[in-house]
């Protein structure tokens, strides 16, 4: 995609952008995990579907966190129709002038990102409980993404990425907590549910229709 302050056309185009830069990485991880753990083969199709959300959750978090940094260099990866719906003209918007329109826009975007994050957790919980290494790898990324989303949710009209950057202490606590509960799906669900209290979540159906022509095709038996 060419960098421009005009943004992306709509949410479908944002889905496709996120797929190209992150969703394919999620699919690659799903393939690698299935090759490494033969017991995952019966779940492979579901893993591949959820893996796209794994990538998009992380990418959307970065897009929202870096929205003003990207703007400084003339780039915008936000969906144009959603901006218009909330009355936001991002091309001429100064960070300090976001107001209620930009706040409501960001909250909608956070709900979408949270929906993908929920799918990403489901992806992670499908991994064998005894494979704590690959579980931790996924959980650390999801935990930090959730903390960032929560910081943006508390301050959607932030004017610089440093205002929503998570602390090193938070990173350490996230790594410790997710590692400690890595083998327990019940504990992990409770941990993420508690950490996400207050956040609205949009249900994301998989596979995404917007990228159905791009995803890895099912292998024929």
Locations of regions flagged by a protein language model:
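Catalytic cores of Mg2+-dependent Asp-rich isoprenoid enzymes
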Residues: 1-57, 69-221
């Amino acid at each position: 995609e060419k960098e421009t302050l005009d943004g992306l056309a709509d949410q479908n185009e944002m889905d496709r952008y996120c797929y190209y830069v992150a969703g394919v990485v999620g699919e690659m991880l799903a393939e690698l995990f299935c090759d490494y753990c033969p017991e995952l083969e019966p779940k492979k199709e579901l893993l591949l579907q959820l893996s796209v959300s794994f990538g998009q959750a992380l990418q959307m978090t970065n897009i929202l966190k870096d929205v003003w940094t990207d703007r400084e260099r003339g780039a915008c990866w936000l969906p144009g129709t959603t901006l218009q719906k909330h009355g936001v003209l991002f091309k001429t918007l100064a960070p300090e002038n976001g107001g209620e329109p930009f706040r409501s826009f960001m909250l909608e975007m956070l709900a979408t990102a949270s929906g993908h994050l929920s799918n990403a957790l489901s992806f992670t919980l499908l991994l064998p409980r005894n494979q704590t290494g690959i579980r931790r790898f996924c959980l650390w990324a999801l935990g930090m993404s959730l903390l960032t989303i929560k910081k943006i949710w508390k301050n959607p009209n932030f004017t610089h990425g440093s205002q929503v950057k998570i602390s090193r202490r938070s990173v350490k606590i996230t790594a410790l907590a997710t590692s400690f509960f890595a083998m327990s799906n019940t504990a992990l669900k409770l941990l993420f549910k508690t950490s996400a209290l207050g956040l609205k979540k949009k249900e994301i159906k998989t596979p995404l229709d917007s990228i159905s022509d791009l995803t890895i095709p099912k292998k024929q038996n």
